[in-house]
Amino acid sequence: MKIYLTNQNLKFSKHLEYFKNQSVMKYEKSKLDEKISSQDIDFEFSKINFDFFYNYQIFPENIIESYCQWNHENRNMQIGDTIVQQVFLPPHKTLSQKVIFAVRINKIIDEPKRKGFSYETIEGHVEKGVSIFTIEKNTQKTVFKIHTFSKPGNLLTCLAGPIFSLPYQSFCTKKALNNVKEIVEQQQRFSKG
């Protein structure tokens, strides 16, 4: 974890090179806290353009700005790719602390009724564990899910967790759920055109 007063987006490639050489945080999944959050999406699953999703455009840009290894290398997402995350605390691009950490793709999901990916946190992240992001076709609806297994990644987040980290994580999750719903439903409005 690195903390800055200035936006680091012009230095993302430098941060990417650093984090590509860092290890995934060790964890035992059975000892992590599990949470599943979901959002129904009013759009036919088969008509969704998943490009935004596989480019990690999940969180609103005032919360997390990211830099993905596969975009840096002009290709599609692969297992082992690193994502640099710049978190804005509070969620405002200008008037905030900029916290930099990273995650690594450990699974890509490409099933007929389920698309998504998962990543694990890299050393220095505020959490340790794994997050799974999927858009799924259930019996009658399309659902976006965020499924996490995590614990605080360092002493600071362990101490601040109940007061700050957990409420902020819930806030970010709600914003991500709404953001993906909005992006997909905009596709529907655009396709009706």
Per-segment meaning from a language model:
Residues M1-P91:
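Hydrophobic ligand-binding cavity/cleft-lining segments
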Residues T94-N138:
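Hydrophobic-ligand binding "helix-grip"
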Residues G153-G193:
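A conserved amphipathic terminal alpha-helix motif
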Residues D40-D42, P91, E111, H125, ...:
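Residues that cap or initiate secondary-structure elements
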Residues H92-T94, L156:
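A generic structural signal for short coil/turn motifs at secondary-structure boundaries
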Residues V84, G116-S118, V143-K145:
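General beta-strand recognition
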Residues T121-P167:
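Beta-strand/loop substructures that line and gate deep hydrophobic ligand-binding cavities in soluble
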